[in-house]
């Protein structure tokens, strides 16, 4: 396919140092170099999700709570453009945000891009204080436990408009009290933004 003006490109890449330490960076940019009004609005929401989650992260705080903070910011931002409604806290508790943010906030990083996950995500990212959720979206959070000094991790939120998922949730009337499906139809061709 040929990239066209008005489309977005999402680049998720990294490099490895001679000492074998990994990096990971994700950015989304417009093909023509200029975001349109809708793209700019979604980009600003994702940027705020990242900024607030990043600032929340410090030793002793759980990464799961950073994820939930980003999810709450997503709901508030999507409410501001008419795609969601209701109290953000309630929408996040029911998982309504996961229609747009269906993955975890990030992961640990070190000698591997997803550091030590070969041992098992539950062993690395969870402990006796934090169990993995079975809620859609939150179940894909790779790291939930309390952060410790020296942890290296990514903070890479995203918002996506996945037609198949939208159709499925709309048909099931899932989270109708939080999602404005009528307005959401105009975003079916949007794609997504992650940073």
Over which residues does each language-model region extend?
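Active-site neighborhoods and metal-handling regions in enzymes and metal-associated proteins
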Residues: 1-195
């Amino acid at each position: 396919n040929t990239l066209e003006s008005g489309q977005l490109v999402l680049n998720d890449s990294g490099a490895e140092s001679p000492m074998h330490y990994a990096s990971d960076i994700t950015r989304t940019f417009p093909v023509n170099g200029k975001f349109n009004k809708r793209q700019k609005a979604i980009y600003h929401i994702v940027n705020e999700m990242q900024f607030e989650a990043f600032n929340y992260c410090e030793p002793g705080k759980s990464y799961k709570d950073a994820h939930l903070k980003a999810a709450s910011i997503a709901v508030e931002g999507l409410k501001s453009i008419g795609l969601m409604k209701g109290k953000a806290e309630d929408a996040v508790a029911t998982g309504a945000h996961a229609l747009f943010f269906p993955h975890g906030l990030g992961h640990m990083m070190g000698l591997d891009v997803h550091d030590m996950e070969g041992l098992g995500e539950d062993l690395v990212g969870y402990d006796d204080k934090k169990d993995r959720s079975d809620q859609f979206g939150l179940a894909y959070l790779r790291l939930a436990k309390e952060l410790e000094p020296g942890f290296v991790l990514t903070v890479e939120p995203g918002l996506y408009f996945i037609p198949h998922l939208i159709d499925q949730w709309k048909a099931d009337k899932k989270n109708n009290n939080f999602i404005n499906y009528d307005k959401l139809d105009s975003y079916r061709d949007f794609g997504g933004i992650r940073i």
